[in-house]
């Protein structure tokens, strides 16, 4: 059994990619948990908050009594890039409008991310009537304005407030979480790109395999802008 486990680690590309990343980045600003800890924190995944293509989201509680949201990722044939993006980017940030990553788990094929708990969930359920989880609370114009300003401040921090520029690439209502006072926090950094501060144009390959040239408000000159549109 032990021999089989070692063979799996050696042959699994995702495991090797994540292991190499953690080794090259040294100590991170967030705590690393064992999978057994994740089960204790979530009370064996008792309280499920949601389900997505990434896996399941569960409510949990740390030993100090702090409530958290635990994203348990599906086992994937990919190279673990989205998991690495989450750990690498959020661990670099500290801002009132960016969700806090409180820890992560990487144990063989098991991967999980632990975030601060946002009682009001995502902005999506408050603005889309067709959403099955739609709530009866109507957000006033002042609240919506404050949410928009908060999102803008969070993006400005990612672009200009960190040592490197962090480009989110997936800003949408589902990825904007709201705390108990409806203050917005940007979440879900799976598609994030990190690039030098002096760079204003980046070339990347989209999810459909098409390449895009993306420009934003950096210092360099831009003559051509082409943005991918997600429908």
Model-based region annotation:
Residues 2-231:
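Conserved eukaryotic protein kinase-like
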């Amino acid at each position: 059994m032990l021999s089989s486990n070692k063979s799996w680690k050696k042959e699994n590309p995702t495991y090797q990619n994540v292991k190499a990343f953690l080794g090259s980045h040294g100590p991170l600003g967030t705590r690393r948990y064992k999978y057994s800890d994740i089960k204790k924190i979530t009370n064996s995944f008792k309280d499920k908050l949601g389900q997505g293509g990434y896996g399941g989201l569960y409510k949990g509680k740390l030993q100090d009594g702090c409530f958290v949201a635990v994203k348990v990722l599906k086992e994937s044939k990919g190279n673990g890039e989205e998991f690495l993006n989450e750990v690498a980017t959020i661990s670099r940030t500290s801002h009132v409008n960016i969700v806090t990553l409180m820890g992560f788990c990487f144990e063989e094929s098991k991967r999980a991310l632990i975030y601060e708990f946002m009682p009001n969930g995502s902005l999506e359920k408050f603005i889309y009537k067709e959403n099955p989880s739609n709530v009866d609370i109507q957000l006033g114009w002042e609240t919506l304005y404050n949410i928009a300003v908060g999102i803008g401040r969070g993006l400005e921090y990612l672009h200009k407030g960190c040592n490197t520029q962090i480009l989110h690439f997936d800003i949408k209502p589902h990825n904007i979480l709201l705390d108990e006072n409806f203050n917005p926090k940007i979440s879900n950094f799976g598609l994030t790109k990190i690039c030098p501060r002096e760079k204003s144009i980046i070339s990347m390959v989209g999810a459909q395999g098409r390449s895009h040239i993306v420009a934003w408000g950096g210092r360099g000159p831009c003559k051509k802008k082409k943005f991918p549109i997600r429908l």
